[in-house]
Amino acid sequence: GIPCGESCVFIPCTVTALLGCSCKDKVCYKN
């Protein structure tokens, strides 16, 4: 539920995905 500061509208989460973030509502979130 914490915004990771990366969007995933056109491309999936990249850098933040390595930190455990996933795409939700066009934004990368963690928990």
From Swiss-Prot:
The entry's comment on post-translational modification says: This is a cyclic peptide.
Cross-referenced InterPro entries: Cyclotide, Cyclotide_bracelet_CS, Cyclotide_sf
| PROSITE patterns assigned | CYCLOTIDE, CYCLOTIDE_BRACELET
Instruction: Kindly list the places in or outside the cell where this protein is found, as annotated in its UniProt entry.
Output: Secreted
Q: Where is this cross-link: Cyclopeptide (Gly-Asn)?
A: G1-N31
Q: Which UniProt keywords apply?
A: Disulfide bond, Knottin, Oxidation, Plant defense, Secreted
UniProt keyword Transmembrane helix present? no
Q: Which cysteines link up through disulfide bonds? A: C4-C21, C8-C23, C13-C28
One GO process term, biological-process aspect: defense response
Key word Signal present: no
Q: Which Pfam families match?
A: Cyclotide
Provide one Gene Ontology cellular component: extracellular region
Q: Which family does it belong to?
A: Belongs to the cyclotide family. Bracelet subfamily.
Instruction: Provide the domain comment.
Output: The presence of a 'disulfide through disulfide knot' structurally defines this protein as a knottin.
Free-text function comment from the UniProt entry: Probably participates in a plant defense mechanism.
What is this protein identified as?
Cyclotide cter-R
- Organism annotation: Clitoria ternatea
